[in-house]
Amino acid sequence: MERTLIAPGVHLSCDPASKFNRCRISIHFAFPAQRKTATAHALLPLVMERGYADCPDMTRLTKKLAKLYGADLTVDARPMGCNHNLCVSVTGIKNAFALEGEALTAEYTKIALGAAFHPYFVDGCFDPQAVSIEKQMLKKGLEDEINDKRIYCLHQANREFFGDSPAGVRQEGYLEEVDGLTPAMLTAAYQQMLRTANIELLVLGCDAAQTAAIRDALLAELACIDRAPLLLVENMAMPAIAPVHKTENYDMVQAKLCMLFTLGQPMQPQQLAAVRLAMALYGGSVTSRLFLNVRERDHLCYYCSSSFQSFTGSMAVNSGVEHADAARAEQAILKELADLCTGPITDEEFEDCRRGLLSGMNGVEDSLGGIESWYYIEVLRAGANSAAPIQSPEQARNALRAVTKDEVRDILRRLTLSVSYLLTKEDAAHAAE
């Protein structure tokens, strides 16, 4: 993957991806998340995906994509630590496979740039009807999260964990703000994104001439905008604190327990391989300690797994437990972490986890979407404002092969519990309270 700076705050990353019969053009907008515009930016991709100036409704857009041999347009948003990311992506077959020699890549470029820079406006703002429809969809999604107690517990724990820090901005939006959003507010948020976002153009499966044409078309669009890209927020970590225990009571069959840990300092890119193996050993695989011991041996959890967020240097352990077993489950989870830090790690479990990770990483390059996700996250993880080298999947696999038990223990020893959040129908709180 080649990455070059083509304008202030704008990079081009490209790969010919010759083994695929499809190509992909993606435009990523990344900018610091802000509390006051979080809900508008959560709504933005839903409205943008409905169409653009040349295809102002979903019917015409669907017909256009169908004529291009079933091309696909997606506009989505995803949180990246303290930064927000909106991506416009078009995927379709390469020119070489067009039955009548159509210039498909040029059409994909028009669609991607149209969706990104020429949305369908009515009187200078997003279409009020489209905004109204998508507000209901966003509202329903946020309401559904409350009913999914696993997600709700994680969000409540995150709110307690991050507090007022930039990573605490709820980038999925705030339910109480959805009804108040207007087309004018959404348009203002969109225009702010165009002015201030760092832009990553990823072109996969195109030759050099096609890539250059896509680059030039993007630069022509940007020339019409008074750009002032903001520096992205670098990776962070919450400071270590005395553990905070919170309990909410709900009438539910299964209690939910979410425990959040912090590294205490930002994760460095060179630590990533050890972090991956540490998570697989602790709770990220079917051979992990949490799965084999807390779930299978002790029968304390219906599920119990760990995950790590590199942008915020935090680990989450999520579990579903019997109400009466919540305190025991928490202590068992902490014990497994302590045992990995100070006790033996067998060669068998260590290599099982390593092989499992390597097997999963072997599939990264099996799809254009996988390649794009890998490299874009690597860009952000390394620091989008820096010239740090970007790690390829093969380099990451080699780094994983070199990780030692001591390196894994060093990562795990840095993790300290900050928040333990319990949803239960019983009034009994954690044993630690």
Task: State where each predicted segment sits.
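Short, Gly/Pro- and small/polar-rich lid/capping loops
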Residues: M1-G9
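Short, polar/flexible loop-turn hinges at active-site or ligand-entry regions and domain interfaces
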Residues: G51-D54, A96-L99, H118-D127
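Acidic/histidine-enriched alpha-helical segments
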Residues: T62, H118-L142, P229-P239, K335, ...
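A conserved active-site cap/scaffold subdomain adjacent to cofactor or substrate pockets
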Residues: M252-K256, G264-M267, L272-G284
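M16 family metallopeptidases and their MPP-like homologs
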Residues: S13-D15, N21-H41, M58-G114, R150-G173, ...
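Active-site SXXK
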Residues: A42-E49
